[in-house]
């Protein structure tokens, strides 16, 4: 059996079982023709072919030759058995059965529902605020006894210098004596009128003999 035939047979079986469970008309083929043949001739023809193939081509289901989409077809295609419930289903509004179950049984009706309590909120302070979110702060009640004087702060005492004053005076005297003993520097010995134009001569003494230890240490780290 091909996969297409298998799914067609499964679809046909499911449609038959669903129809027999929900409808009492007794003939699912007449039901299918009634719903499809008058509006969609191609779908009805396909259903007719499937039915004839499932019947092994040996049984006649009462179909009269003619155009399935034409109103002048078989009587089984255009008429319904007297016990069919299809007309009631066609004229019945959708979800009419469930319209009364949209609300829970304990939900009161609109007339019985209690009106909501409306509380008017004003941005201005009320004259007699009964319930107010931001009440005006009021002074707390104080006793009539005189207020206790505040305790005086401790006077600030400057810390005593750890260096004796005599030692500081002696250091100042030595610095002054050393400053007076130095000879006055003569600018003429260092600079001249042509010092800016003189050629610049350098010697090895002008450079630092030992390199920076930090720089030397960094260079050593890079050596492998």
UniProtKB/Swiss-Prot annotation:
This is Uncharacterized ORF3 protein. It comes from Torque teno sus virus 1 (isolate Sd-TTV31). Residues 139-156 have a biased composition (Basic residues). Residues 128-224 are annotated as: Disordered. Residues 167-182 have a biased composition (Basic and acidic residues). Pfam families: TT_ORF2-like. InterPro entries: HEV_TT_vir_Orf2/Gyrovir_Vp2_N. Residues 129-138 have a biased composition (Polar residues). Residues 185-195 have a biased composition (Low complexity).
């Amino acid at each position: 059996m091909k996969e297409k035939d298998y799914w067609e047979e499964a679809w046909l079986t499911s449609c038959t079982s669903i129809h027999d469970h929900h409808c009492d008309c007794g003939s699912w083929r007449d039901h299918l023709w009634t719903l499809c043949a008058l509006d969609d001739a191609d779908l009805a023809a396909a259903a007719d072919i499937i039915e004839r193939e499932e019947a092994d081509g040996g049984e006649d289901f009462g179909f009269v030759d003619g155009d399935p989409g034409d109103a002048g077809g078989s009587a089984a295609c255009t008429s319904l058995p007297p016990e069919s419930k299809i007309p009631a289903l066609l004229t019945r509004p959708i979800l009419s059965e469930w319209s009364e179950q949209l609300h829970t049984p304990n939900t009161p009706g609109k007339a019985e529902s209690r009106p909501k309590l409306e509380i008017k909120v004003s941005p201005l302070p009320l004259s007699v605020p009964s319930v107010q979110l931001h009440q005006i702060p009021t002074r707390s009640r104080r006793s009539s006894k005189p207020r206790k004087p505040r305790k005086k702060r401790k006077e600030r005492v400057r810390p005593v210098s750890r260096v004796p004053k005599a030692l500081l005076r002696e250091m100042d005297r030595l610095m002054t004596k050393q400053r007076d003993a130095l000879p006055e520097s003569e600018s003429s010995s260092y600079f001249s009128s042509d010092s800016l134009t003189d050629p610049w001569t350098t010697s090895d003494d002008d450079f630092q003999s030992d390199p920076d230890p930090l720089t030397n240490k960094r260079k050593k780290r890079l050596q492998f």
